[in-house]
Amino acid sequence: MWIKNGYRLAKKKKNNNYLFSKERNEKFDVIKNEFYKNKLLTDYLNIKGYKSFQSGKWWLGSWEEGKFDGGMTHGDFARQGRHGDEGLKIGREGLNPIFDFIDQTQEDGDPFFVWYAPFLPHTPHDPPQELLDKYIKLAPSEPVAKYWAMCEWFDKTVGDLMNYLKEKSLDENTLIIY
């Protein structure tokens, strides 16, 4: 392994599947096991009756391991799970899993916690065309324009979530940490 400019560069394997290999999974388990020796935010929230939902980036295995009540990330390297796998669709493909979770907690009368950590603005940089058009003439290059558009897309999804909370009259009694 080499460190260059703050990035870890793993030696390439012949089949280039190291990221999803059993070997990497076993090494990563050591890190996860150390992390999970500690109490988690979800532990404290569960004690107070909160229901919690994970979406987006989650580098520590599955949502179940994080003691969430629901979620999107399976975290299984053998199934190409990495950094959030299914959870990475959140934001890019809408917010319906989060909205459904919030609706269910309200139906059940439970307080809720949502982990919303979309992979926006990470690659692939494929913003909606209207956002790209906004930045293409302002940016020094197309890749920079795409990145800026992705950042705005991320902000837009946060706004969509906040608007949803307002529509449900939950905005006055909800803490948002951004």
Features from the language model and the residues they span:
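Formylglycine-dependent sulfatase
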Residues: 1-178
